[in-house]
C-alpha cells in the first residue's frame, strides 16, 4: 500500500524554520524595503517580516532582510556584515559592556554556517543575543520614520505609539 508510506513520509518531513518563539521586536516600517515584499504576501506574514520573525529562507525574505540590514548600516557596499555598526546600536541602546559577548555569539554562530552573504543566516546569528530586540526597539524609537502609522501597520495598532 502506497498510502501509509506516503503518510509516513509526510509525518517525517519537518520543514526547517528559524523562529519558534517571538523575538519581541516591535513592528517597524522601512519604506525602501517594503518594495522587497511581494504584493501577494498576506498581512500576517508581512507583520512577521516587519518584526524580523522570518521563518523560511526564501528569495523574498532574503531580499527584505538584506534591505533592512542595509538601512540599519549593518551591511557594507559589498554585502558584508559590519559588526561595528551593530555594536554602535548596542551602545546607543545602553549596552556598553557587551561587545565581547555580542561578537562571540555572532562569530560562533557564523562559524557554523561558514562565510556567507545570506541575510537570513546573518539574521539568525544576530538574533541569538537576547538583547538584540531591545536594541532594535530602541533604534525604532529614535527614528520616528520607522514607526508605521495606522494605515501602514499590519501587526495591530497596540504597539505603534
From Swiss-Prot:
Protein's recorded name: Short form salivary protein D7S
Signal sequence, renumbered to the chain: 1-18
GO molecular function, one term: odorant binding
UniProt key word Nucleotide-binding: no
Disulfide bonds: 33-67, 47-155, 109-125
Keyword list, A-Z: Disulfide bond, Secreted, Signal
Domain of life, per lineage: Eukaryota
Residue stretches in coiled coil: none
Biological function: In contrast to the related D7 salivary proteins, does not bind serotonin.
Family assignment from sequence similarity: Belongs to the PBP/GOBP family.
CC per GO annotation: extracellular region
Main localization, broad class: secreted
Subcellular location: Secreted
A Pfam family it matches: PBP_GOBP
Amino acid at each position: 500500500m502506497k498510502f501509509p508510506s506516503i503518510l509516513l513520509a509526510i509525518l517525517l518531513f519537518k520543514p526547517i524554520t528559524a523562529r519558534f518563539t517571538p523575538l519581541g521586536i516591535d513592528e517597524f516600517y522601512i519604506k525602501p524595503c517594503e518594495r522587497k515584499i511581494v504584493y501577494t504576501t498576506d498581512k500576517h506574514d508581512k507583520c512577521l517580516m516587519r518584526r524580523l520573525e522570518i521563518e523560511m529562507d526564501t528569495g523574498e525574505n532574503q531580499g527584505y532582510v538584506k534591505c533592512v540590514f542595509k538601512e540599519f548600516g549593518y551591511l557594507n557596499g559589498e554585502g558584508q556584515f559590519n559588526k561595528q555598526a551593530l555594536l554602535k546600536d548596542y551602545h546607543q541602546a545602553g549596552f556598553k559592556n557587551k561587545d565581547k559577548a555580542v561578537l562571540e555569539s555572532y562569530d560562533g554562530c557564523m562559524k557554523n554556517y561558514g562565510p556567507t552573504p545570506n541575510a537570513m543566516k546573518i539574521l539568525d546569528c544576530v538574533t541569538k543575543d537576547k538583547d538584540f530586540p531591545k536594541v532594535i526597539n530602541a533604534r525604532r524609537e529614535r527614528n520616528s520614520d520607522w514607526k508605521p502609522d495606522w494605515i501602514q501597520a499590519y501587526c495591530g495598532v497596540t504597539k505603534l505609539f
